[in-house]
Structures are given as C-alpha cells and as structure tokens.
UniProtKB/Swiss-Prot annotation:
KW Transmembrane (keyword) present: no
Record family assignment: Belongs to the L/F-transferase family.
GO cellular component: cytoplasm
Location of this chain's protein in the cell: Cytoplasm
Designated gene of the protein: aat
Protein name per its UniProtKB record: Leucyl/phenylalanyl-tRNA--protein transferase
Catalyzed reactions per annotation: N-terminal L-lysyl-[protein] + L-leucyl-tRNA(Leu) = N-terminal L-leucyl-L-lysyl-[protein] + tRNA(Leu) + H(+); N-terminal L-arginyl-[protein] + L-leucyl-tRNA(Leu) = N-terminal L-leucyl-L-arginyl-[protein] + tRNA(Leu) + H(+); L-phenylalanyl-tRNA(Phe) + an N-terminal L-alpha-aminoacyl-[protein] = an N-terminal L-phenylalanyl-L-alpha-aminoacyl-[protein] + tRNA(Phe)
Top-level taxonomy: Bacteria, Pseudomonadati, Pseudomonadota, Alphaproteobacteria, Maricaulales
UniProt record, GO biological process: protein catabolic process
Catalytic EC class: transferase
Residues in coiled coil: none
Organism: Maricaulis maris (strain MCS10) (Caulobacter maris)
Its biological purpose: Functions in the N-end rule pathway of protein degradation where it conjugates Leu, Phe and, less efficiently, Met from aminoacyl-tRNAs to the N-termini of proteins containing an N-terminal arginine or lysine.
Record has Coiled coil as a keyword: no
Any single Pfam family the record assigns to this protein: Leu_Phe_trans
Amino acid sequence: MRGFGAEELLNCYARGVFPMAEGRDDPRIYLLDPDERGIIPLDQFHASRSLRKTVRQDVYQVTINQDFEAVVAGCAQSAPGREETWINESIIRLYSQLHDAGYAHSVECWSGADLVGGLYGVSLGAAFFGESMFSLRRDASKVALVHLIARLRAGGYSLLDTQFTTEHLESFGARTISRSDYRERLAEALIFEADFSALPDEITGAQALQSITQTS
C-alpha cells in the first residue's frame, strides 16, 4: 500500500479500522472494519487460579519495550495451531515505525537470556489495540497478558481491543460487541490520554496482580 505509513495507520485505528495481510509472503495490506469486535473489559479480566500462581511465582522475567522487533518476529513465526501468519514485511515495517514513534509497545517474557513469549499492540488515547502474542514456553503469553492488563489499569486505559474473540481470549473475559458499540467506546477512549508507563518498566508478578485487583 504505497504512501501508507505510521501516521495513516494511526488514523485508521482512530476510525476503528485495523490492517491485516493474507499471509506472510503477500506484501499487500488490507483494512478491516468487521461487523463485530472483540474486547476485554479491563474491570472484568479473569485469570485462573493456576495462572495467578504462575504469575506470582515470577517464573519469567517480564519487561516492556525491551525487544519490540523480536516480539513481532516471534508472533510472525508459525506455531502449532497457527501454521499461517498474517504478519508480513509491510506489517513489520509499519509497527516498527509506530514503536519508534512511541505508539506501539511490547511485553516480553524471558527465561534467562531467551525470549520465550510476549505480545505487542498499539496505544492511542486511552485505547490499547492488541495485535498478536506468542509463546514458546508454558503460559508465557498468558503471563504477558496479565502484565499488560496491570499496565492498562494502572495507566488509565478504558478500552482493550482484541479485534476478534477466540475461546482462548474468552477464558480471560473477552467478549464480542457490535461495530456501533465499539465505535462509541473507542470515541470515548480517544478523548483521554492514558500512560502505558505508569508502572515501572519491570514489576513483579505480585505487583501485577495487585494492580489488576485494585478498585479503579
């Protein structure tokens, strides 16, 4: 998509539209505006007892924005149950530009020096648009999601957009809403300015869980 850069991508998010590609080897980007959208209400996020235990034990070291490109690359790799990826070179270039401009963020899970999971997304106003996640070790992406929710709650976000819903996301409280409902929520979220860095760059699992359970 010639002439389509970071500024144009942000404008798409502000209109409720998001990009996707057919496959990794297809350089084209399509803009989607589905009839229904997936969200995780931040005050209704659910983490199972076993996941809370894993988070509290700090099985992984969790960081933010330490290796954005590696997280995107991890999300672009094929995995069991995800043989095809929609992340092509154009997507990687665009989101790297957004990251350099301070709008795209990553959450990384490390085991020693190895990146074993993480997620990335876009922050605009008080809305966070989750793009993709990956996991090479048990529960790594789930731990990253818990830490993301903690940051969004602490930073004053009001909308977590998951684009679509899956059974996996529904287990965390994700639900589907209509396009009109989504646009109303988005318009309200864009009025305010949230802070992705409201918490320190590295927090413990116990601190993340405390942030999630605090009354807003």
